[in-house]
């Protein structure tokens, strides 16, 4: 094990000098430095660049407070490796695989795997055309998710990405019954804590591994924690042949952490100040999140959109890798429609008659047509009023508004805030409900009866309570 000495510390970036005759550590190798003489407080560094003349530049996975020039640094000879397998289920740990749930740490002999790996080769890949039912009407109808597919939840600040991902965990992890891996990347610690206790209460935690590198962590940890979660998911897929659900909240923070580190590594910034290696880093992560002939990984990723600008390089780069996109729209939150999913901007390659069936496809496309026409008529209504519309257009507007409200739904995870019980709506019920609205069966019911309900029967009950 070769050793060197700290030459420079600049925030999370540490330069290490190795003696001229020593073998330099390889890129992505983990180095260890002890802050105290008792060797109790260690910091893990990851090699990012070789600068020449025996100097390497590293990124710290923990705070560099207390590091001084001249401290000894040891090369472990391998990449950061984390625990994998059944022992990780029901546990919470950090980027290095150290437990943070106040329970017993992992045994020394637990299986470990390096976080840096190659993506599966082309001939190992497998595709599926099976739909993953979420129980959320707007998603199941207009942008259905594929088993083994990649899903992106796009939205600006405060539009409901984390609540939606928590509802998906509640619905899918409980219905799916398989193994789930939740990776918190640079998000709020409070949300992670709430999620942990909710999962513990519901019993879902027994089949879930949770990995966190939250907002308060240094950028090195936030940059690598997604790979830690992915390594655990890959083990369940490849070694145990399982179908795995991988939740990542938030993939933008992965890019943001890379951007923070990039300038300190001496790279010239690219568009909007992002790192020049943005597309490569995103590709290396996303290409590993895939399904093989041994098992599948269905990934659901929350993606923050800075200033609601979808042309920003970070969300735009992520778009290219996804099968389904669920776009959250701020205007809908202002109208009190939750989940605030934009039915026209969201898309899925699964929405085709071959995959979802003729009836589902016909109802979904008609819903989109009606909503698109309503959007076009809104300018006329705003300027001239409803009276200028033809009878046919007035009927269409009425149905479009009912559809828009019926796309909203109460969530189980939001019950403590709204006081309203959450609902899980099977796909067949969703399709039937929208088909009947399009046929005009409920034109006589008030629009408010369609707001924040589950299946169409809830609308009828709500309307009866309102005196209709």
UniProtKB/Swiss-Prot annotation:
It is an enzyme of class 7 (translocase). It is a peripheral membrane protein. Its main location: membrane. It catalyses: ATP + H2O + 4 H(+)(in) = ADP + phosphate + 5 H(+)(out). ATP binds at residues 155-162. Keywords: ATP synthesis, ATP-binding, Cell membrane, CF(1), Hydrogen ion transport, Ion transport, Membrane, Nucleotide-binding, Translocase, Transport. Its EC number is 7.1.2.2. It comes from the Bacteria. GO terms for molecular function: ATP binding; ATP hydrolysis activity; proton-transporting ATP synthase activity, rotational mechanism. GO terms for cellular component: plasma membrane; proton-transporting ATP synthase complex. It is found in: Cell membrane. NCBIfam families: atpD (TIGR01039). HAMAP family: ATP_synth_beta_bact (MF_01347). Belongs to the ATPase alpha/beta chains family. Produces ATP from ADP in the presence of a proton gradient across the membrane. The catalytic sites are hosted primarily by the beta subunits. F-type ATPases have 2 components, CF(1) - the catalytic core - and CF(0) - the membrane proton channel. CF(1) has five subunits: alpha(3), beta(3), gamma(1), delta(1), epsilon(1). CF(0) has three main subunits: a(1), b(2) and c(9-12). The alpha and beta chains form an alternating ring which encloses part of the gamma chain. CF(1) is attached to CF(0) by a central stalk formed by the gamma and epsilon chains, while a peripheral stalk is formed by the delta and b chains. This is ATP synthase subunit beta. The lineage of its organism: Bacteria, Bacillati, Bacillota, Bacilli, Lactobacillales.
